[in-house]
């Protein structure tokens, strides 16, 4: 039997395999280049970018929890100008699609970022983090209100012709409603889920462990929630989905594909094993070969109910 076909496509972005790296867990790519072959994964998704450099939250801002971790990094990043001048030159040398994750605290910031990134041919697509507070509207999180989310997506859509992936928050009562609002406003694809809001407490000090009090929960603990949401959205609409949440192995990745994901993102696993994404991609190929499956796309949405 010939080698299985692992290639998939997300809104015109062709991936050699369905394994991407999750924003915020893989730096800007170069940081991990000594630990894995960047040309053996499907795509690199950068650390979230803002218009200006951001220092992030005070420490402590990471804490291990049963089955995962909480982080309150605060979207620390170098800013768009330093990314273009210092980070992008390396990414140009890698034959793997680069998707830039971006965020803003106002509609205008999202639009300006998208316009700047639209001019960069090296950027294959944009992933928009809408789990941010709108500082001009009382701090409401864009990604928890369908109307606010649609405003962001619509503005970014008008600001770029690049494939547009919207990263959905799980901190909502109806993820399908949020997904529908984003797709109707111009999203080409959806990635889900972002982290669940959680907290940890130091019993002896009677204080929160994180300086920020709350943080984003990721890792195996959130996988069942992520699987459920991916499945719900895939059943409700025909849109490419990228599954995220507790993917630590090829088995995890394949479960997300059965639930309806076209591709997956590996996040927390990168902290435990810097070569995790490549290992998972190889594991998917091994599964296909052992089970006589010629094309990974046969598994997308193949869950039997």
Swiss-Prot record:
Gene Ontology annotations for the cellular component aspect, listed alphabetically: cytoplasm
Entry keyword annotation includes Transferase: no
Location in or out of the cell: Cytoplasm
InterPro entries, alphabetized: Aldolase_TIM, DHO_dehydrogenase, DHOD_1B, Dihydroorotate_DH_1, Dihydroorotate_DH_1_2, Dihydroorotate_DH_cat, Dihydroorotate_DH_CS, Dihydroorotate_DH_I
CDD domains: DHOD_1B_like
A GO BP annotation: 'de novo' UMP biosynthetic process
Enzymatic reactions: (S)-dihydroorotate + NAD(+) = orotate + NADH + H(+)
Pathway assigned to this chain's UniProt record: Pyrimidine metabolism; UMP biosynthesis via de novo pathway; orotate from (S)-dihydroorotate (NAD(+) route): step 1/1
UniProt binding sites for substrate: 47, 71-75, 129, 194-195
Cofactor names: FMN
Role summary: Catalyzes the conversion of dihydroorotate to orotate with NAD(+) as electron acceptor.
PANTHER family named among the record's database cross-references: DIHYDROOROTATE DEHYDROGENASE (FUMARATE), DIHYDROOROTATE DEHYDROGENASE (QUINONE), MITOCHONDRIAL-RELATED
Family listed: Belongs to the dihydroorotate dehydrogenase family. Type 1 subfamily.
Subunit structure of this chain's protein: Heterotetramer of 2 PyrK and 2 PyrD type B subunits.
Protein name as it appears in the record: Dihydroorotate dehydrogenase B (NAD(+)), catalytic subunit
């Amino acid at each position: 039997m010939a080698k299985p076909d692992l290639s998939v496509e997300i809104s015109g972005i062709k991936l050699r395999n369905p394994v991407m790296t999750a924003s915020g867990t893989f730096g800007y790519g170069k940081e991990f280049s000594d630990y894995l072959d960047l040309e053996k994964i499907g795509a690199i998704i950068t650390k979230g970018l803002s218009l200006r450099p951001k220092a992030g939250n005070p420490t402590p801002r990471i804490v291990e929890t049963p089955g995962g971790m909480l982080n309150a990094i605060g979207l620390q990043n170098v800013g768009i100008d330093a990314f273009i001048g210092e980070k992008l030159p390396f990414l140009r040398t890698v034959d793997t699609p680069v998707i830039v994750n971006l965020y803003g605290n106002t509609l205008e910031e999202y639009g300006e970022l998208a316009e700047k990134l639209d001019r960069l041919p090296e950027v294959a697509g944009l992933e928009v983090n809408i789990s941010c507070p709108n500082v001009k509207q009382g701090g409401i999180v864009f990604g928890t209100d369908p109307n606010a989310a649609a405003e962001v997506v619509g503005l970014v859509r008008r600001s770029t012709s690049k494939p547009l992936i919207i990263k959905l928050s799980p901190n909502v009562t109806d993820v399908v409603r949020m997904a529908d609002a984003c797709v109707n406003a111009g999203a080409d694809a959806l990635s889900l889920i972002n982290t669940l809001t959680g907290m940890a407490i130091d019993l002896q000090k009677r204080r929160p462990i994180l300086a920020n009090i709350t943080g984003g929960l990721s890792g195996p603990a959130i996988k069942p929630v992520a699987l459920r949401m991916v499945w719900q959205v895939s059943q409700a609409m025909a849109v490419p989905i990228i599954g995220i949440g507790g993917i630590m192995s090829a088995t995890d990745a394949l479960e997300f594909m059965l639930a309806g994901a076209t591709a997956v993102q590996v996040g927390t696993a990168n902290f435990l094993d810097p070569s995790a994404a490549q290992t998972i991609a190889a594991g998917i190929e091994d599964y296909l070969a052992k089970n006589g499956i010629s094309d990974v796309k046969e598994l997308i949405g193949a869950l039997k109910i």
